[in-house]
Amino acid sequence: MKLFRKIQKWFENQENLYYLFLIILIVPNIVLCFTEPMPLVAKVCNVLLPFSIYHMIMSWSGNCGKTFWILFPFLFFGAFQIVLLYLFGQSVIAVDMFLNLVTTNPGEALELLDNLIPAIIIVVLLYIPALVLAAVAVSKKRRLSETFVRRERKRARITVIAGILSLVAAYLFDARYELKSDLYPANVCYNIALAFQRTAQTQHYAETSKDFTFQAKTTRPEKNREVYVMVIGETSRAANWSIYGYNRNTNPELTKIKGLTAFSHVLTESNTTHKSVPMLMSSVTAHDFNSIYRQKGIITAFKEAGYRTAFFSNQRYNHSFIDFFGKEADICDFIKEDTGDGSYNPSDDELLKLVAAELAENASKQFIVLHTYGSHFNYRERYPADNAFFLPDFPVDAELKYKDNLINAYDNSIRYTDNFLARLIRMLQEQDIDAAMLYTSDHGEDIFDDDRHLFLHASPVPSYYQIHVPFLVWMSDNYRKNYPDFLKNAEINRQKNISSSASFFQTMLELGGIDTPSRNDSLSVINASYTEKNRVYLNDHNEARSLDDIGMREEDFTMLQTKGIVYR
C-alpha cells in the first residue's frame, strides 16, 4: 500500500506529469533517430527543434493535462508512426499511407490488422495511460505553480533558439536535407496537406480529363481477327519465379510454352498498387506522374482504334485511377463487388470464365485487361487448398518464426499464377488468330528476406524484393508468323534493363498495332529501337528520384547487383 501511495502521489504531481508528457511527445523523434539514415546533425535537429516547440506549447498553460489534449493530433501521428515503424522498419508516415486509408478496402486492412497487435499494444501502453492522466488533471483542475511555468517558459525559449540553430546546421552540413521530408512532425503535416490536395484532384478527375484523346487508330487490316490481353498481377516478385532462376519449380507450365519471352531485369517505379497500376495502364511514368489527372488509360486508346474492350478485376474498388481507367471499357466488372458481400473472396479463376465469355462474342478486334489478386497477403487464400505444392503452408501469421510457412504459401501462389497464365494462353492459342498477352506485376513483396526482417510492401522506402517484378510477353503462332520481328526484338531485349511502369503501356500499344502521338517505341520491349533509360523511382511526393536517392539500403543494392540489374 505504501508503494502504491508513492506511485499515486508521483502521478498526481503536475510537474512530474509535465515532463512525462514532454517525453511521450518526443518518443517518435527519438525512435526515428535509430531508423532513419540521416547524418548526426539532422538527427540532433529532428529531436531538439520539435522538443523545443513542444516545450514552448506545454508552458503556455498552467494545466499541462489540457495542453497535452490540445496536442492530441500529434499523439495520433506518433501512434501511427510507431505502428508503421514496426511494420516497415523505417521512414515517416507517407502521403501514400494517408491515401491508403481511403483506397485500401476493409478486407485487406483486416487481413493485416491481426499481425500488428504487438505494435498496437505498445501504442496503447504508451499513450492511453498518459491521456487518462491528462484527463484527470483537467477534470480536477490541477495546475502547475506560476513559478514552475515561468521557469519552463524561459527554458523553452532557450531550447527553441538551440533548435533553430540545429536546423540551420542541418541545412549547412547536409546538402540533401529538406524540412518537408526530414523533420518530424513537419514532414507528416506536409504529407497530410499533399494527401488532401491529391484527394481533391482525384475527385475532379472526370472534369480535368474529359477532353483528353489519344487520337488513336489501328494499323492492322480490318478483316483480321485480333485479341490482346493485358494482365496486371498483384504482389508477385521476380525473385520467386523459377523462370528467372529461383531454385524452386514455381513455373512448371510457363517454362514449356512456345512464343513466351520472360524479361529478367525489370523494375517497377512504385511499390504501391494505387500508383503502379495506373502507370501500367497509361502513358504516365515517374517523370510526369502528376499529369495523370488530365489523361485517360490504355483502354480508351484501343476503343478509339475500334476495339471492343473489357476490364475484369478480382480486386475491390479503390475509388481512384484503377477504377477510372477500368470503367473506360465497354464491359467492366469488379467481381468482388458483384455480390454485396464484403467477405466474398473469389479466386482469379473467375476472371478466366469472363475471358471465355468475352472471346465467345467473336468480335473482330478485342482488347481485354485483367487485374488479378495474384499473391496478395494472406498468401494461403490465393490458391485452392488442394493445389498446395510446398508444405507446410500454415500457419502464416506475419511473424519471423513462420517465415518458412510464409515462403511455402507465397510460392504456391506463384505456381497458381503460373497455371492461371498458362490456361489463359491456351485459351487464346485455341482461337487460332492473331493474339498476344502481356503480363507484369504491380510490385513485389518482402517476406523476412534478410536481417532487416521486412514484411509486405508499400513501405515508404522500397526494398529490392518490392521492385523487381516479372514481365512476360506471349505471342500466338499466327501472330509470330505475321509479325516475326516482334519476337526477334523481344529476345534481343529480354536481358536489358527495363522499367515496367514505362514500358508496359508502350509495349501493349505496339503489340496491338495502335498508332497514337502518345506512343514511344523506344520504350517498347518488342521494338528494335528500345533504349535503356536511367532507373528512377516515384517517391512519396510524386518526384522521380534515382534509386540511390530514396533511402534504399546496402542489402538492396547488393541484390540488384547479384541479379545483374543496373540501378543507375
Descriptions of predicted regions:
Residues R248-N249, I433-D434, T440-D485, D521:
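Histidine-centered active-site microenvironments of extracellular/periplasmic hydrolases
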Residues M1-A186:
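Transmembrane and membrane-interface helices of multi-pass
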Residues V41, L179, A286-F289, D341-G342, ...:
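Active-site rim elements
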Residues F311-S313, F367-G374, D411-I414, A436-S441, ...:
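Short beta-strand segments
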Residues I161-M230, T235-D397, S500-S501, Q506-T531:
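Active-site-proximal alpha/beta segments of enzymes that process anionic O-linked groups
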Residues V229-M230, S413-L456, F505-L509:
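Metal-dependent active-site segment of extracytoplasmic phospho-/sulfohydrolases and closely related
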Residues Y54-M56, K353-A356, F394-M437, V473:
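A long, amphipathic alpha-helix that forms part
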Residues W10-L20, S59-T67, T300, Y317, ...:
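Membrane-interface soluble catalytic domains
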